[in-house]
Amino acid sequence: MSASLVGSEMCIRDRMITIRVEGDEWEPSIDRTPGVVREIGASPEEIIAKIREAGIVGMGGAGYPTPIKTAVPADKKVDCLIVNGIECEPYLTADDRLMVEKAEQIIVGAKILNKALGIQNAIIAVDENKPAAIEVLRKITRSYVGVNVQVMKTKYPQGAEKQLIEAVTGREVPSGKLPADVGCIVQNVGTVNAVYEAVQKNKPLFERVVTVSGDAAETPSNFMVRIGTPASFLISKVHGNPAEIGKIIFGGPMMGTSAVNINAPITKLSSGILLFKDDISFKPEETVCIRCGKCVEACPVGLMPFAIASQVRDGDYHEMKKLHVLDCIECGSCAYICPARIPLLDYCKLGKYELKKSK
């Protein structure tokens, strides 16, 4: 566990640690000279060590430790790094802003990861609805061999790891397998930028860009904030009135989680805070499944959510496994489109939980 500032522990309450600030140990160690450091002097082993020491994890939502993801097993042959700049959930623009303002750092970060992986090819995948980011990335990549920009159709959930690999390379990750099994590694743009800062500037991961938006945010904005910053601080910065806020969501409206505490802290995985005037979690009355198949059509993984829901109700773990419930990426498309208003995503989550627990 690491903190974004130096101080002494005051108390632990509600799964949060309160720290009394006593200085900033990071300042002297960070190279704060202006300009991008293009020359990569670190060896592959040194790169992975620096990533580990900096506490870098996947910042797109999964939070998987980056040094583990970068240290590919000897029996896996990786030939492509995909930098994930797909930000397909409504309201969120943190990655977009980062690509516009830190484009060259991201490109050098991709080159650093290429060196650590022992490969030559990196593709930065960006939604077609991000023209400013596309323009600046394309302009700068002309000076870098082995890094290319690929513009993707804007659709949800294009940014999911396995779906992005198939869209970019045409390779399909089999059920139960990992991206490395088809020769790919996917890293979020925020993670790649953090890799650059760790390796080239000796900067640990103690801050990130966070979108604060929604109809209860008077001035929606993106902020670079320290990990551990209370949500209430950012809410005040967008002139949000706590008395008018009916729902706070950490992340996006499709895959985010509700926050019950206005002082909940920003974490390494907090891409956004959404503020809504009404409680948008209102659930219409559930009716009987009519076997329309819309959930099957909407599922990007090709699952049958209606059948999974039925087996979860029956507690049939064997059938759940046969229906590949563990492949569910929890995008929520099935529940969103269901005309019977069945909480299919909840059933899929419960099925995954029960199946893992039964092992």
Q: What are these regions, as identified by a protein language model?
A:
Residues 24-26, 86, 96, 126-129, ...:
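Short, ordered loop/turn segments at secondary-structure junctions
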Residues 30-33, 62-63, 69-70, 92-96, ...:
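Short acidic, glycine/serine/threonine-rich loops at helix termini
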Residues 2-7, 12:
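Single conserved hydrophobic/aromatic residue that forms the stacking wall/gate
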Residues 40, 44, 51-64, 74-106, ...:
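Conserved mixed alpha/beta catalytic, RNA-binding, or beta-rich assembly cores of soluble enzyme
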Residues 270-283, 296, 300-359:
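Ferredoxin-type iron-sulfur electron-transfer modules in oxidoreductases and energy-metabolism complexes
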Residues 110:
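Polyanionic/metal-chelating signatures
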Residues 119-231, 237-242, 252:
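Hydrophobic alpha-helical positions that pack around
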Residues 13-66:
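Fe-S ferredoxin-like electron-transfer domains
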